[in-house]
Amino acid sequence: MDLVFRPERYPFLTQDLPGVGGEIRVEPEDFQVEEVPAYLPKGEGEHLYFLLEKEGRTTREVLEFLRDEVGVPEKEIGVAGLKDKRAKTRQWFSIPRKYEDALCLLENLQGVRLLAADLHTNKLRTGHLKGNRFHILIRRPKGGVAEAEAVLKRLAEKGVPNYYGPQRFGLGGLNPVRGYKLVKEGKGRGSPWLKRFLIGSLQSLLFNDWVALRMALGLYDRVVLGDWAKKHATGGEFLVEDPGEAERALRLEISATGPLFGKKYPEAQGEARAIEDEVLARYGLKREEFRARRGARRPIRVPLAEWKVEEAPEGLWLSFFLPKGSYATSLLREVMKVEALDHLEAEPAPEDAEGL
């Protein structure tokens, strides 16, 4: 198996259910994302929080405008996550209060609208969000509401496969190949950020392979002794030492977590570790080769909430909530059974930056 990311190499959880087909992102307003913050500004403090609605703009473009036109040093700009360009998105930013009077300059940035602003006591930081609400139009579907609802019901019962989406792997899915060379050779050209991102793409592909292997082994909704499991209600992780935890996994209270290999992550034991080692062995990789990078664990699946399907003259509207760090494309591929999810921005997911 090679290191080029191809979505079709990863199995569907709902393989036995038909997809609705269709197209997404024909227009930016077809893909709407609303950030759900971990907290709201208190109304006092030295940091100004503001909510922007943007269309046709990446998060990075807004950051650069705040830096170059408003005059805020980039390290003082706060953002909880990155959002795609070809979408209509709402997300929070923060800047030091002393730049408050210059915020009106945002009127000069086409495609951006200021919705709210208030003060808070700390800078907004990566991962300071609960997740995202999505409202997505599937145009020209071949299936209808019943087919989409059947898939979403299964995903609500079993959890959404937490695959990394195409955004993570670059044009043509080649970034893991470049990351592999960096891991093996220990050096390469490019900025530290770029190197971290490329190795992150390799980590992400190995994680996706781990998810697929657990599915093939019948362990998607199970935990085994030696797994590190995540509690979905609290986010806490623990080592599975009691066979009785399997019942909690079946109820989607807990899920197995897979590795983003590095030097600082809880390592699985026994059978669970052997599954991880099998993925590494496919590519002749060893755990110690990732010691120069931080590590983390990521759940094999995420709960699906607030889901709804509505039929409209223009197609099917899907609404749902996913926790931070997960990808809407992982849900959409299950519903549509189509891999050509185009117009995706090749940006890293900052919610998982600690693992890179």
Curated annotation (Swiss-Prot):
Ranges in a coiled coil: none
Domain TRUD residues, every copy: 159-302
Catalytic activity: uridine(13) in tRNA = pseudouridine(13) in tRNA
Listed EC numbers: 5.4.99.27
Keyword line: Isomerase, tRNA processing
Domain of life: Bacteria
GO molecular function (one): RNA binding
GO biological process: tRNA pseudouridine synthesis
Gene3D superfamilies in alphabetical order: TruD, catalytic domain, TruD, insertion domain
Enzyme class: isomerase
InterPro entries per the UniProt record, alphabetical: PsdUridine_synth_cat_dom_sf, PsdUridine_synth_TruD, PsdUridine_synth_TruD_insert, TruD_catalytic, TruD_insert_sf, TruD_pseudoU_synthase
Cellular component GO terms, alphabetical: cytosol
Residues at the active site: D84
Family (UniProt): Belongs to the pseudouridine synthase TruD family.
Function summary: Responsible for synthesis of pseudouridine from uracil-13 in transfer RNAs.
Protein name: tRNA pseudouridine synthase D
